[in-house]
Amino acid sequence: MFEVNPVKFKIKDLADRTLLLRGIFDYDAKKERLEEVSAELESSEVWNNPENAQALGKERSALELVVKTIDDMDSGLEDVEGLVELAVEEEDEETFADASSELDALEKRLEELEFRRMFSGPHDISDCYLDIQSGSGGTEAQDWANMVLRMFLRWGEAHDYKPELIEVTDGDVAGIKGATIKFTGEYAFGSLRTETGVHRLVRKSPFDSSGKRHTSFCSVFVYPEIDDSIEIDINPSDLRIDTYRASGAGGQHVNKTESAIRITHVPTNTVVQCQNDRSQHKNRDAAMKQLKAKLYELEMLKQNADKQQAEDAKSDIGWGSQIRSYVLDDARIKDLRTGVESRNTQSVLDGDLDKFIEASLKSGL
């Protein structure tokens, strides 16, 4: 005979959690807004302003996640309750197993919405850029920066964030000196923003024949793409614009012409680069968009003193403080902020970062 009480307890628990989220997300207001946005998107005139139409489309997706999940939880839990009652009456183990399976699926849906509670920032829903910069240490540090690049590309692919390599600067012997990735998709910035900081590698270097342990550093800085409604005042006289021949992965198609663009905002010494298009004009437009996003995020960090990242953002080693150590010989990767560890170093380096990201978001970083 099957155990009914644990299932009934789980149904009540999920119902209580759904009710809590209904209040937290202001379900009634979101449902009303969803109807308004859907009506606007059905209008034939909406595409007269493509950027507004895209913004409305993003808003609708975010609203649907909340409204549809809560609606599905309400109806789904009612259906499961009915299945459990039927299974008990008929003493039908197969029906009971179906009810349990459906309950597990509903819990996963609810957990996703609970996780979204942590995305409370005004730009968490946005696409984002991720800059990687190797620290001092020559070839070993540049190889580490390349490993970090691969790690985040893999993470982005696994989460369908369409990672796009905007720019990469090759290392002197191996690896890279720096790179920029763009991630496109809902909550890309919210998911990655706690990865800003210094990532430290400890290993026996393959570039040192003596087999000594080396410590290398690599900085990561994550910032959201901003829309045109946010005014960023940039004086053209403050910019130094250089063209150069692209190098490295992502630039192989533009090496024959100097189409890559580097823009330096002289007052803040903020540098952005773009080389992923054959057109110098398109690369320049993309780099300017990236520069505006970066300057905006740096200004937000300055205003957000409790994060203590603004001044670190100007240091040579990178942006933010040291956040995670990757000690490969001991098979241990540890987040220094949350204490979360993983012994599966290869899995993490292959992009399995969710455990670290979720813990940092839950801790309010």
Curated annotation (Swiss-Prot):
SMART domains in the cross-refs: PCRF
PTM annotation (N5-methylglutamine): residues: 252
Subcellular compartments: Cytoplasm
Molecular functions per Gene Ontology: translation release factor activity, codon specific
Keyword terms of this UniProt record: Cytoplasm, Methylation, Protein biosynthesis
Keyword Membrane in annotation: no
Predominant subcellular localization, coarse grouping: cytoplasm
InterPro entries from the UniProt entry: PCRF, Pep_chain_release_fac_I, Pep_chain_release_fac_I_sf, PrfB
Pfam families per the UniProt record, alphabetical: PCRF (PF03462), RF-1 (PF00472)
Gene Ontology cellular component annotations, sorted alphabetically: cytoplasm
PTM: Methylated by PrmC. Methylation increases the termination efficiency of RF2.
Parts of the chain that traverse the membrane: none
Similarity comment: Belongs to the prokaryotic/mitochondrial release factor family.
Function: Peptide chain release factor 2 directs the termination of translation in response to the peptide chain termination codons UGA and UAA.
Entries under NCBIfam families matching the protein: prfB (TIGR00020)
Protein name (record): Peptide chain release factor 2
Gene name, Swiss-Prot/TrEMBL: prfB
